[in-house]
Amino acid sequence: MSSALAPVGIFDSGVGGLTVARAIIDQLPDEHIIYVGDTGHGPYGPLSIPEVRAHALAIGDDLVGRGVKALVIACNTASAACLRDARERYEVPVVEVILPAVRRAVATTRNGRIGVIGTQATINSHAYQDAFAAARDTEITAVACPRFVDFVERGVTSGRQVLGLAEGYLEPLQRAQVDTLVLGCTHYPLLSGLIQLAMGDNVTLVSSAEETAKEVLRVLTERDLLHPHPDDPRAAGPSRVFEATGDPEAFTRLAARFLGPAVSGVRPVHHVRID
């Protein structure tokens, strides 16, 4: 049985999942977390579903083996590729990023026209389209924005080049007259100002990061796994461990855009292996 004192494990293909980590830290400030960025293999968007599944489950195995009390798949592509496998494989609760965002979008839309943007792999998986299928009177327009992740990973989140790219990607959503847009990749919140500019103020952006953090809070509360309040004698100050399967220094530089100086001393992970 998991302990409330155990950490929450979070992973992504790179730094994008730090938007989820940031939201979890904001909403659950007492929780210990371990974050793994799979920069040695990511981004996952261009990979095949079997490749993504293999990389994601290897990291999941590692985190669960280290005793995390919950596993957060902070990557839309990985959520689409391996959620069912992960929930069958692990005894700890597994939280993903797709359904929380879908619920918020359905509750937010006024005209029933909802847009989704994500990596090519996420859009091709139809994970969002399938998740919206149960919602009545909704019309979904899904668009792949494959180059967005590359810009974010390089730290380029503004300027004419990326704005022009965004306008081209988002034009089908404007034609569809969506009033709600799901940012279906955890990298995309760093482009939210630019995306809002391209879409206009009448379109509401839904961040999977914020909604996923709310789902983590719900799951931990439901299972009596919330970390004790700081006044509780069992409690200790929250520890935040960040690891990368690639270059830890490069990860640290990029991660500063998400969490500022909170990310330091990133540890390289050499023991995550793909069978």
From Swiss-Prot:
Substrate binds at residues 12-13, 44-45, 76-77, 186-187. Pathway: Cell wall biogenesis; peptidoglycan biosynthesis. One of its GO terms (molecular function) is glutamate racemase activity. Pfam families: Asp_Glu_race (PF01177). PROSITE patterns: ASP_GLU_RACEMASE_1, ASP_GLU_RACEMASE_2. Keywords: Cell shape, Cell wall biogenesis/degradation, Isomerase, Peptidoglycan synthesis. GO terms for biological process: cell wall organization; peptidoglycan biosynthetic process; regulation of cell shape. It catalyses: L-glutamate = D-glutamate. Transmembrane segments: none annotated. The keyword Chloroplast does not apply. It comes from the Bacteria. SUPFAM superfamilies: Aspartate/glutamate racemase. InterPro entries: Asp/Glu/hydantoin_racemase (IPR015942), Asp/Glu_race (IPR001920), Asp/Glu_racemase_AS_1 (IPR018187), Asp/Glu_racemase_AS_2 (IPR033134), Glu_race (IPR004391). Its EC number is 5.1.1.3. It is an enzyme of class 5 (isomerase). The active site is at 75 (proton donor/acceptor), 185 (proton donor/acceptor). Provides the (R)-glutamate required for cell wall biosynthesis. Belongs to the aspartate/glutamate racemases family. This is Glutamate racemase. The lineage of its organism: Bacteria, Bacillati, Actinomycetota, Actinomycetes, Mycobacteriales. The gene is murI.
